[in-house]
């Protein structure tokens, strides 16, 4: 019995002597852990901050670009359409697109279908054709490309590969006619795809009914 008590006492003393060293070692390891994690976190944080900053700068550049770019207002200035004009819109897409009031009404409809960029692109091409200054033409052509042709743009219009190749060649030396093929393709797309739906839309029917009622009252 006495020998067993002596042995137990020795074990307790040995355990007591080991505890400070073990605790110190654990404390040291604990200190290294947070420092290492902090270092990693700082590196990751720096990378994330740089990424966010670059994205913000790009966003600001794009916003500035768009503000300077088209000069195309939310709607064109035009007198209110007459009943005769609105009836003429139903005769052909060309007659609709010839008048500012017709383009405004059609553009309002395209906005409901999230395809307003087609009209914006067409209008930008029309503006480009009116320019004669070489430097202005080059700048407008570049902006049109970035806004409506680039696959990175949220307002990219739908064009086939052949037309895109033509544009890329034309952009080597931009002119008023750089986007003629693309403009025709988008015009045809609006004519065949969006125009029939516009003629059956509430926007067109409400306008026609309103003008008809005013005509009767007069």
From Swiss-Prot:
Protein name as it appears in the record: Regulator of G-protein signaling 20
Cellular localisation: Membrane; Nucleus; Cytoplasm
Compositionally biased tracts (Polar residues): 14-26
Modifications made to the protein after synthesis: Fatty acylated. Heavily palmitoylated in the cysteine string motif.
Keywords tagged on the record: Cytoplasm, Glycoprotein, Lipoprotein, Membrane, Nucleus, Palmitate, Signal transduction inhibitor, Ubl conjugation
One GO CC term, this protein: nucleus
Subunit structure: Forms a complex with G(alpha)z/i2 subunits and mu-opioid receptors; the formation of this complex results in mu-opioid receptor desensitization. Interacts with OPRM1.
Function: Inhibits signal transduction by increasing the GTPase activity of G protein alpha subunits thereby driving them into their inactive GDP-bound form. Binds selectively to G(z)-alpha and G(alpha)-i2 subunits, accelerates their GTPase activity and regulates their signaling activities. The G(z)-alpha activity is inhibited by the phosphorylation and palmitoylation of the G-protein. Negatively regulates mu-opioid receptor-mediated activation of the G-proteins.
Main location group: membrane
Domain RGS: 92-208
GO biological process, one term: negative regulation of signal transduction
Organism: Gallus gallus
Sequence ranges of Basic and acidic residues compositional bias: 1-10
PANTHER family: REGULATOR OF G PROTEIN SIGNALING, REGULATOR OF G-PROTEIN SIGNALING 20
Gene: RGS20
This protein's record includes keyword Nucleotide-binding: no
Region described as Disordered: spans on this chain: 1-26
InterPro entries: RGS, RGS_sf, RGS_subdomain_2
Membrane topology label: Lipid-anchor
Highest taxon in the source lineage: Eukaryota
SUPFAM superfamilies attached to this UniProt entry: Regulator of G-protein signaling, RGS
Lipoprotein recorded as keyword: yes
